[in-house]
Amino acid sequence: MSTQGRVLFLSFDVEPDAPPYLNGLRGVDQGLPGILDLLDELRVKATFFVVGKVALERSALIREIVDRGHEIGSHGYTHERLDRLPPQEARESIASSIEVLRRFSRVVSFRAPNLALPPFLVRSLYELGVRVDSSLALYKPPFARRPFCQHGVLRVPVTVTSSVVRSPISSRVLPLMFRHWFVTIFLHPWEFIRIRHWRPDIWVWTGSGLYLKLKSLVKAYQAQGYYVVPLGRATKPVMSCGNW
């Protein structure tokens, strides 16, 4: 991948259904297989940030992600927010998840649950072998606008929240609004099934129609010259973090 190209980092957070409001794995069981089929159809590869406990409970599905050529990264051992844990417990959560996931594949990428990563843990990520972190977002403090290097870890911000990606007009609007040389999009398998909950940001525009929306969005970015790559690929031309 050349740093001169325009890249779309496509990622999925493989976690229990809409945590902490629901607690099941319907999304993983029913939504994830369709995501893998869609990516095969599009001939693109993505990053799947997997909760460690989910990997233990659904090991066959995680193995299938790897066998189909996608990257797996860590999403913590449970989906508990790291900024609400004691420092050592937070680090152990990351370390435990990486230990589990390395049974399936190499792990160089990380995304914190709820995009909440205390700054002191960035150095710990590097010590644990992580080289790419995607726990920052354009729309949340500190409003990171572009990738940067911190303690040897390349930090790649998320461009837009997943509930916006679910919008019926996302494939028309997002490629016009976000036309940087990099765009980072994430979704969850539970968003591809019909979710019932009182919070609108959880259930609105969820369901099987999201497959077609995602297909249209990816094709819209490809039409603008974007290459779809896993986040872990970002380390290849910039191992020193000096070229971003």
Question: Where are the regions a protein language model picked out?
Answer:
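Catalytic alpha-helical scaffold of carbohydrate-active enzymes acting on polysaccharides/glycoconjugates
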Residues: 1-109, 114-155, 171-244
